[in-house]
Design a protein with these regions (language model features):
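Active-site diphosphate/adenylate-binding microenvironment
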Residues: 179-251
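Glycine-rich phosphate/diphosphate-binding loops and the adjacent beta-loop-alpha structural elements
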Residues: 36-50, 60, 218
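Gly-rich Lys/Arg/Thr-decorated short loops/hinges at beta-loop-alpha junctions or inter-strand turns
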Residues: 2-15, 78-79, 180-191, 236-238
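Conformationally flexible catalytic loops at phosphate/diphosphate-handling active centers
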Residues: 1-34
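Glycine-rich phosphate/diphosphate-binding loops that line cofactor/substrate pockets in enzymes
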Residues: 24-39, 59, 100-103, 206-215
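Short glycine-rich anion-binding loops that position phosphate/pyrophosphate groups of nucleotides
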Residues: 44-46, 72-74, 111-114, 222-224
Length: 252
């Protein structure tokens, strides 16, 4: 079919990404200073930013913040980093739940906190202070009440927060506690001799030793992926590609 139209082709547009203002950064710093057990939750749109991976590492160290990655985003920080506190994935182990629920301040950047990471709408809880950073406002105060809502691209927020003068190491014990829980839980997942073949835990452990640090890892949906989620030692130079909605066949 053909038809005459009067509209002219559009021109390329420059995308404008939201940034936090000074007051929002000061509010965030104020909450960090008051918190005894703050935790950083990262995921969602941060997956598209290599710079964000660097900033997450720097922010965690600068403010002594344990880092929880949302489902399918464990590649945002080195999993052997002392700041890594685990993944908010499907049926997270009890120690990872404790890392999330024992925090008194939750700073979530890039993820809407819908679906898997909220652990059945129990996280963040009403007793936790919640700072939510998203590039648009439609998801603020929809599922959870936010104490500070910041409209900003995640990378822009991380960059501005990292450029502040405040540095804190008062949460070192909390950082160690969270990472030790993650490591101790991982150590309990013993390799077993399988009568009908190979224990997939052994396979994942060997992959973790052999794959290059800049690998692209793709995974599908299903219970078998739990081996990867619980055992694979992701590096921030890697790229993890997988579906958050559990659709079969995405790994292919």
């Amino acid at each position: 079919l053909e038809a005459e139209i009067s509209n002219k082709p559009g021109h390329p547009i420059n995308l404008i990404y939201a940034k936090p203002n000074n007051q929002e950064i000061e509010e965030t710093l104020d909450h960090i200073k008051k918190a005894q057990k703050p935790i950083l939750v990262v995921g969602g749109e941060l997956q598209f930013s290599k710079k964000s991976k660097v900033l997450i590492k720097e922010i965690a160290k600068k403010f002594s913040l344990p880092v929880l990655c949302t489902y399918e985003h464990q590649d945002l920080i080195d999993n052997d980093s002392i700041y890594y506190a685990g993944e908010l994935g499907l049926r997270p182990p009890e120690p990872i739940k404790q890392n999330a629920l024992q925090a008194d301040l939750v700073i979530c950047i890039g993820h809407q906190m819908n679906g898997v990471p909220n652990m059945g709408y129990t996280f963040p809880s009403d007793t936790q202070k919640f700072i939510h950073v998203l590039p648009e406002k439609n998801f603020f105060n929809k599922l959870f009440k936010t104490d500070v809502s910041i409209i900003s691209k995640g990378e822009n927020f991380l960059n501005k927060l990292n450029n502040t003068d405040y540095i804190s190491n008062k949460n070192t014990d909390w950082v160690n506690e969270c990472h030790n829980r993650y490591m101790n839980n991982k150590a309990t997942l013993d390799i077993r001799e399988a009568e009908d073949g190979l224990d997939f835990g052994a396979l994942i452990d060997e992959l973790g030793k052999q794959v290059p640090e800049d690998s692209i890892i793709t995974n599908d949906a299903g219970n078998f992926t739990s081996w990867m989620h619980h055992r694979f030692p992701f590096k921030s130079k890697m790229k993890l590609i997988g579906s958050e909605i559990g659709a079969m066949g995405m790994g292919i």
